[in-house]
Amino acid sequence: DRDWHADGDSGYITMSWKAASGAASHGVYIGTDSAKVEKATTSSPEYKGSQTGTTYKLVNPSVHKTWWWRIDEKDASGRVVPGKLWAFERRRLAFPDAEGYGRYAHGGRGGKVVYVKNLNDAGAGSLREAVENSIGPRTIVFEVGGIITLKSRLTINDSRITYAGQTAPGKGIVIRGCSFGTAGMKDGIIRFNKVRVGYTGNTWDGTGLTGADFSIMDHVSQSWAIDEGFSSRGGKNLTLQRTMIAEQLNVANHQNYPAGTAHGYAATIGGDVGSFHHNLLAHNEGRNWSLGGGLDAAGYYAGRLDIFNNVVYNWGGRATDGGAHEVNFVGNYYKEGAATTQHTTLNAQLEGTGKG
Protein backbone atom coordinates (compact mmCIF):
# COMPACT_ATOMS: atom_id res chain seq x y z
CA ASP A 1 0.00 0.00 0.00
CA ARG A 2 1.04 3.59 -0.66
CA ASP A 3 3.73 2.64 -3.17
CA TRP A 4 4.36 5.99 -4.83
CA HIS A 5 6.98 4.58 -7.22
CA ALA A 6 5.23 1.55 -8.70
CA ASP A 7 7.01 0.04 -11.69
CA GLY A 8 4.80 0.46 -14.75
CA ASP A 9 7.65 0.81 -17.23
CA SER A 10 6.44 -2.23 -19.19
CA GLY A 11 3.04 -0.61 -19.70
CA TYR A 12 1.20 -2.27 -16.85
CA ILE A 13 1.22 -2.68 -13.07
CA THR A 14 0.42 -5.99 -11.42
CA MET A 15 -1.39 -5.76 -8.10
CA SER A 16 -1.37 -8.77 -5.81
CA TRP A 17 -2.86 -9.70 -2.46
CA LYS A 18 -3.09 -12.62 -0.07
CA ALA A 19 -6.44 -14.39 0.04
CA ALA A 20 -8.21 -14.58 3.37
CA SER A 21 -8.98 -17.99 4.80
CA GLY A 22 -12.18 -19.32 3.22
CA ALA A 23 -12.25 -16.82 0.33
CA ALA A 24 -13.73 -18.35 -2.82
CA SER A 25 -13.55 -15.30 -5.10
CA HIS A 26 -12.30 -11.72 -5.14
CA GLY A 27 -14.12 -8.63 -6.41
CA VAL A 28 -11.72 -6.07 -7.88
CA TYR A 29 -12.41 -2.32 -7.68
CA ILE A 30 -10.02 0.31 -9.00
CA GLY A 31 -10.10 3.98 -10.03
CA THR A 32 -8.58 7.41 -9.48
CA ASP A 33 -11.22 8.78 -7.09
CA SER A 34 -10.77 7.38 -3.58
CA ALA A 35 -14.34 8.12 -2.48
CA LYS A 36 -15.84 6.45 -5.55
CA VAL A 37 -13.67 3.36 -5.18
CA GLU A 38 -14.49 3.08 -1.48
CA LYS A 39 -18.26 3.28 -2.12
CA ALA A 40 -18.35 1.38 -5.42
CA THR A 41 -20.73 -1.53 -5.99
CA THR A 42 -20.76 -4.26 -8.61
CA SER A 43 -22.71 -1.91 -10.89
CA SER A 44 -20.12 0.90 -10.65
CA PRO A 45 -17.55 1.59 -13.39
CA GLU A 46 -14.81 1.04 -10.78
CA TYR A 47 -15.81 -2.63 -10.54
CA LYS A 48 -13.52 -4.75 -12.73
CA GLY A 49 -15.08 -8.13 -12.08
CA SER A 50 -14.83 -11.18 -9.85
CA GLN A 51 -11.94 -13.65 -10.04
CA THR A 52 -10.45 -16.59 -8.18
CA GLY A 53 -6.84 -15.51 -8.63
CA THR A 54 -5.00 -13.06 -6.37
CA THR A 55 -3.36 -10.80 -8.97
CA TYR A 56 -4.76 -8.14 -11.28
CA LYS A 57 -2.94 -6.43 -14.15
CA LEU A 58 -3.77 -2.75 -14.73
CA VAL A 59 -2.76 -1.79 -18.27
CA ASN A 60 -1.35 1.66 -19.09
CA PRO A 61 -2.20 3.44 -15.83
CA SER A 62 -1.71 7.20 -16.06
CA VAL A 63 1.44 8.56 -14.42
CA HIS A 64 -0.50 11.73 -13.54
CA LYS A 65 -2.97 10.06 -11.19
CA THR A 66 -3.12 8.38 -7.81
CA TRP A 67 -4.76 4.97 -8.21
CA TRP A 68 -7.03 3.58 -5.51
CA TRP A 69 -8.14 -0.04 -5.25
CA ARG A 70 -9.87 -2.50 -2.98
CA ILE A 71 -10.57 -6.22 -3.00
CA ASP A 72 -13.88 -7.58 -1.65
CA GLU A 73 -13.76 -11.28 -0.78
CA LYS A 74 -16.67 -13.70 -1.08
CA ASP A 75 -16.79 -17.06 0.68
CA ALA A 76 -18.52 -20.24 -0.50
CA SER A 77 -21.80 -19.25 1.17
CA GLY A 78 -21.91 -15.96 -0.77
CA ARG A 79 -20.99 -13.72 2.17
CA VAL A 80 -18.99 -10.67 1.02
CA VAL A 81 -16.34 -9.02 3.19
CA PRO A 82 -15.46 -5.50 1.93
CA GLY A 83 -11.77 -4.81 1.55
CA LYS A 84 -9.64 -1.92 2.75
CA LEU A 85 -8.71 0.93 0.43
CA TRP A 86 -5.19 0.80 -1.03
CA ALA A 87 -3.29 3.28 -3.19
CA PHE A 88 -0.30 3.57 -5.50
CA GLU A 89 1.22 5.87 -8.11
CA ARG A 90 3.13 4.90 -11.21
CA ARG A 91 6.73 6.04 -11.19
CA ARG A 92 8.22 8.48 -13.69
CA LEU A 93 11.49 10.35 -13.97
CA ALA A 94 12.00 13.42 -11.79
CA PHE A 95 13.24 15.22 -14.93
CA PRO A 96 14.46 13.98 -18.34
CA ASP A 97 18.15 13.34 -17.51
CA ALA A 98 17.66 12.05 -13.97
CA GLU A 99 19.61 8.86 -13.32
CA GLY A 100 20.34 6.56 -10.41
CA TYR A 101 18.31 5.40 -7.45
CA GLY A 102 16.76 8.80 -6.81
CA ARG A 103 15.59 9.29 -10.39
CA TYR A 104 11.92 8.67 -9.58
CA ALA A 105 11.60 11.43 -6.98
CA HIS A 106 8.17 13.08 -7.18
CA GLY A 107 9.21 16.52 -6.05
CA GLY A 108 6.39 19.02 -5.82
CA ARG A 109 4.39 17.75 -8.79
CA GLY A 110 0.69 18.40 -8.38
CA GLY A 111 1.19 20.77 -5.47
CA LYS A 112 1.47 24.53 -5.09
CA VAL A 113 3.99 26.87 -6.70
CA VAL A 114 5.77 29.08 -4.15
CA TYR A 115 7.66 32.17 -5.32
CA VAL A 116 10.82 33.47 -3.68
CA LYS A 117 10.56 37.23 -4.14
CA ASN A 118 13.54 38.58 -2.18
CA LEU A 119 16.99 37.67 -0.85
CA ASN A 120 16.12 38.07 2.83
CA ASP A 121 17.05 35.44 5.39
CA ALA A 122 13.46 35.14 6.61
CA GLY A 123 10.01 36.65 6.32
CA ALA A 124 7.40 36.96 3.60
CA GLY A 125 8.70 36.06 0.16
CA SER A 126 11.96 34.59 1.46
CA LEU A 127 13.49 31.22 0.67
CA ARG A 128 13.21 30.26 4.33
CA GLU A 129 9.47 30.87 4.28
CA ALA A 130 9.15 28.74 1.13
CA VAL A 131 11.11 25.89 2.72
CA GLU A 132 9.84 25.94 6.30
CA ASN A 133 6.16 26.81 5.76
CA SER A 134 4.62 23.32 5.69
CA ILE A 135 1.88 23.66 3.11
CA GLY A 136 2.26 20.26 1.45
CA PRO A 137 3.78 19.41 -1.93
CA ARG A 138 5.27 22.47 -3.60
CA THR A 139 7.65 23.72 -6.25
CA ILE A 140 9.90 26.59 -5.20
CA VAL A 141 10.70 29.05 -8.00
CA PHE A 142 12.59 32.32 -7.95
CA GLU A 143 11.67 35.81 -9.09
CA VAL A 144 15.08 37.11 -7.95
CA GLY A 145 18.70 36.15 -8.36
CA GLY A 146 21.65 36.92 -6.12
CA ILE A 147 23.13 36.07 -2.72
CA ILE A 148 21.02 34.86 0.22
CA THR A 149 22.96 35.22 3.48
CA LEU A 150 21.52 32.83 6.04
CA LYS A 151 21.57 33.65 9.74
CA SER A 152 20.83 30.06 10.77
CA ARG A 153 20.79 26.63 9.19
CA LEU A 154 18.11 26.09 6.53
CA THR A 155 16.82 22.52 6.39
CA ILE A 156 14.17 20.85 4.25
CA ASN A 157 12.17 18.51 6.49
CA ASP A 158 9.02 18.20 4.39
CA SER A 159 8.36 15.75 1.59
CA ARG A 160 7.50 16.31 -2.06
CA ILE A 161 9.41 19.52 -2.65
CA THR A 162 11.07 20.73 -5.83
CA TYR A 163 13.75 23.40 -5.47
CA ALA A 164 13.97 24.82 -9.00
CA GLY A 165 17.09 26.97 -8.86
CA GLN A 166 17.18 27.17 -12.64
CA THR A 167 14.24 29.58 -12.51
CA ALA A 168 16.31 32.32 -10.84
CA PRO A 169 17.21 35.16 -13.23
CA GLY A 170 20.75 36.28 -13.99
CA LYS A 171 23.48 34.15 -12.45
CA GLY A 172 21.08 32.31 -10.15
CA ILE A 173 21.01 31.92 -6.39
CA VAL A 174 23.98 31.67 -4.02
CA ILE A 175 23.37 30.58 -0.42
CA ARG A 176 26.04 31.62 2.07
CA GLY A 177 26.59 31.90 5.80
CA CYS A 178 25.08 28.58 6.98
CA SER A 179 24.27 25.07 5.82
CA PHE A 180 21.45 24.30 3.40
CA GLY A 181 20.36 20.68 3.33
CA THR A 182 17.78 18.08 4.29
CA ALA A 183 16.71 16.06 7.32
CA GLY A 184 14.30 13.27 6.50
CA MET A 185 13.01 14.73 3.23
CA LYS A 186 11.17 12.28 0.99
CA ASP A 187 10.59 12.66 -2.75
CA GLY A 188 12.68 15.81 -2.95
CA ILE A 189 14.28 17.40 -6.01
CA ILE A 190 17.02 20.01 -5.58
CA ARG A 191 18.47 21.48 -8.77
CA PHE A 192 20.75 24.31 -9.88
CA ASN A 193 21.86 25.65 -6.55
CA LYS A 194 25.09 27.23 -5.33
CA VAL A 195 26.17 26.97 -1.68
CA ARG A 196 29.17 28.98 -0.41
CA VAL A 197 29.11 28.79 3.39
CA GLY A 198 32.30 30.72 4.10
CA TYR A 199 34.13 31.30 7.37
CA THR A 200 31.62 32.18 10.09
CA GLY A 201 33.15 30.80 13.27
CA ASN A 202 30.75 27.84 13.19
CA THR A 203 31.58 24.35 11.96
CA TRP A 204 28.97 24.20 9.21
CA ASP A 205 28.53 21.55 6.54
CA GLY A 206 27.70 22.72 3.05
CA THR A 207 24.72 20.80 1.72
CA GLY A 208 23.44 17.25 1.51
CA LEU A 209 20.70 14.64 1.50
CA THR A 210 20.93 13.46 5.10
CA GLY A 211 18.10 11.07 5.94
CA ALA A 212 16.41 11.65 2.58
CA ASP A 213 14.47 9.00 0.66
CA PHE A 214 13.66 8.87 -3.07
CA SER A 215 15.44 12.19 -3.56
CA ILE A 216 17.84 13.67 -6.11
CA MET A 217 20.31 16.56 -6.16
CA ASP A 218 21.42 17.79 -9.57
CA HIS A 219 23.62 20.59 -10.94
CA VAL A 220 24.67 21.91 -7.54
CA SER A 221 27.88 23.83 -6.92
CA GLN A 222 29.19 23.70 -3.36
CA SER A 223 32.31 25.26 -1.79
CA TRP A 224 33.84 26.73 1.38
CA ALA A 225 32.27 24.58 4.09
CA ILE A 226 34.03 24.18 7.44
CA ASP A 227 33.18 20.52 8.09
CA GLU A 228 32.32 18.77 4.83
CA GLY A 229 30.77 19.87 1.59
CA PHE A 230 28.16 17.13 1.23
CA SER A 231 26.68 14.40 3.41
CA SER A 232 24.02 11.76 2.83
CA ARG A 233 24.20 9.72 6.01
CA GLY A 234 21.07 7.70 6.71
CA GLY A 235 19.63 8.24 3.24
CA LYS A 236 17.83 5.80 0.95
CA ASN A 237 17.16 5.73 -2.79
CA LEU A 238 19.36 8.75 -3.51
CA THR A 239 21.09 10.39 -6.45
CA LEU A 240 23.79 13.06 -6.46
CA GLN A 241 24.62 13.94 -10.05
CA ARG A 242 26.39 16.57 -12.14
CA THR A 243 27.53 18.45 -9.06
CA MET A 244 30.77 20.19 -8.10
CA ILE A 245 32.13 19.89 -4.55
CA ALA A 246 35.25 22.02 -4.29
CA GLU A 247 37.52 24.14 -2.12
CA GLN A 248 36.34 23.29 1.38
CA LEU A 249 38.01 25.57 3.92
CA ASN A 250 41.03 23.62 5.10
CA VAL A 251 42.43 25.26 8.26
CA ALA A 252 39.40 27.11 9.58
CA ASN A 253 39.08 26.28 13.28
CA HIS A 254 37.02 23.10 13.02
CA GLN A 255 35.45 22.65 16.44
CA ASN A 256 36.47 18.98 16.70
CA TYR A 257 40.19 19.48 16.05
CA PRO A 258 43.06 21.46 17.58
CA ALA A 259 43.80 24.87 16.10
CA GLY A 260 45.82 24.64 12.91
CA THR A 261 44.53 21.18 11.96
CA ALA A 262 43.74 20.63 8.29
CA HIS A 263 40.26 19.34 7.46
CA GLY A 264 38.71 20.54 4.18
CA TYR A 265 36.43 17.54 3.68
CA ALA A 266 34.57 16.96 0.43
CA ALA A 267 31.85 14.41 1.15
CA THR A 268 30.72 11.53 3.32
CA ILE A 269 28.30 9.49 1.27
CA GLY A 270 25.86 6.98 2.66
CA GLY A 271 22.73 5.45 1.27
CA ASP A 272 20.77 2.26 0.99
CA VAL A 273 20.82 2.59 -1.95
CA GLY A 274 22.65 5.64 -3.34
CA SER A 275 23.99 6.73 -6.74
CA PHE A 276 26.81 9.24 -7.15
CA HIS A 277 27.72 9.95 -10.76
CA HIS A 278 29.17 12.60 -13.06
CA ASN A 279 30.40 14.77 -10.20
CA LEU A 280 33.59 16.80 -9.79
CA LEU A 281 35.49 16.83 -6.48
CA ALA A 282 38.36 19.32 -6.60
CA HIS A 283 40.80 20.97 -4.19
CA ASN A 284 39.56 19.19 -1.06
CA GLU A 285 41.98 17.92 1.60
CA GLY A 286 40.09 14.71 2.35
CA ARG A 287 36.95 12.56 2.08
CA ASN A 288 37.01 12.45 -1.71
CA TRP A 289 34.76 10.36 -1.11
CA SER A 290 34.43 8.94 2.40
CA LEU A 291 32.06 5.97 2.17
CA GLY A 292 29.75 6.31 5.15
CA GLY A 293 27.80 3.08 4.96
CA GLY A 294 28.09 2.52 8.67
CA LEU A 295 26.25 -0.27 10.47
CA ASP A 296 22.59 -1.20 10.47
CA ALA A 297 20.47 -1.55 13.61
CA ALA A 298 21.72 -5.12 14.11
CA GLY A 299 25.36 -4.10 13.82
CA TYR A 300 26.00 -5.45 10.32
CA TYR A 301 27.80 -3.51 7.61
CA ALA A 302 25.37 -1.27 5.72
CA GLY A 303 25.31 0.97 2.68
CA ARG A 304 24.91 0.08 -0.99
CA LEU A 305 26.49 2.62 -3.29
CA ASP A 306 26.94 3.12 -7.03
CA ILE A 307 29.88 5.47 -7.65
CA PHE A 308 30.62 6.01 -11.32
CA ASN A 309 32.00 8.49 -13.85
CA ASN A 310 33.24 11.01 -11.29
CA VAL A 311 36.40 13.13 -11.42
CA VAL A 312 38.54 13.72 -8.32
CA TYR A 313 41.30 16.33 -8.65
CA ASN A 314 44.00 17.76 -6.39
CA TRP A 315 43.07 16.07 -3.12
CA GLY A 316 45.39 16.47 -0.15
CA GLY A 317 46.13 13.76 2.41
CA ARG A 318 43.03 11.62 1.84
CA ALA A 319 41.46 10.45 -1.38
CA THR A 320 38.69 7.81 -1.17
CA ASP A 321 38.21 5.81 2.03
CA GLY A 322 35.58 4.74 4.54
CA GLY A 323 33.37 1.70 4.28
CA ALA A 324 30.11 0.35 2.87
CA HIS A 325 28.47 -3.05 2.49
CA GLU A 326 28.18 -3.20 -1.31
CA VAL A 327 29.84 -0.81 -3.76
CA ASN A 328 29.98 -0.53 -7.55
CA PHE A 329 32.97 1.67 -8.36
CA VAL A 330 33.22 2.22 -12.11
CA GLY A 331 34.80 4.73 -14.49
CA ASN A 332 36.08 7.21 -11.93
CA TYR A 333 39.08 9.39 -12.84
CA TYR A 334 41.66 10.64 -10.33
CA LYS A 335 44.21 13.32 -11.18
CA GLU A 336 46.81 14.49 -8.69
CA GLY A 337 47.50 18.18 -8.22
CA ALA A 338 49.90 20.46 -6.40
CA ALA A 339 48.28 19.76 -3.01
CA THR A 340 48.29 15.96 -3.31
CA THR A 341 50.39 14.17 -0.69
CA GLN A 342 48.68 10.78 -0.67
CA HIS A 343 49.39 8.86 -3.85
CA THR A 344 47.06 5.92 -3.26
CA THR A 345 43.63 6.86 -4.49
CA LEU A 346 41.66 3.78 -3.43
CA ASN A 347 42.66 0.86 -1.22
CA ALA A 348 40.19 -1.99 -0.71
CA GLN A 349 41.28 -3.11 2.74
CA LEU A 350 38.63 -5.49 4.04
CA GLU A 351 35.87 -7.62 2.64
CA GLY A 352 33.52 -8.69 5.38
CA THR A 353 29.90 -9.81 5.50
CA GLY A 354 29.42 -10.08 9.25
CA LYS A 355 29.14 -7.57 12.01
CA GLY A 356 31.37 -4.52 12.15
Where are these regions (language model features)?
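Extracellular beta-strand-rich solenoid/capping regions of secreted or surface-exposed proteins
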Residues: 9-10, 22, 128-136, 147-164, ...
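Recognizes extended acidic, P/S/T-rich segments that occur
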Residues: 27-64, 76-84
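Hydrophobic loop/turn residues within beta-sheet-rich immunoglobulin-like superfamily modules
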Residues: 20, 61-63, 178
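Right-handed parallel beta-helix
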Residues: 160, 164-165, 169, 186-197, ...
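Pro/Thr/Ser/Gly-rich low-complexity, intrinsically disordered linker/stalk tracts
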Residues: 1-21, 86-92
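Acidic Gly/Asp/Thr-rich repetitive segments characteristic of extracellular carbohydrate-active
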Residues: 95-140
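Hydrophobic beta-strand segments within extracellular beta-sandwich modules
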Residues: 69-70
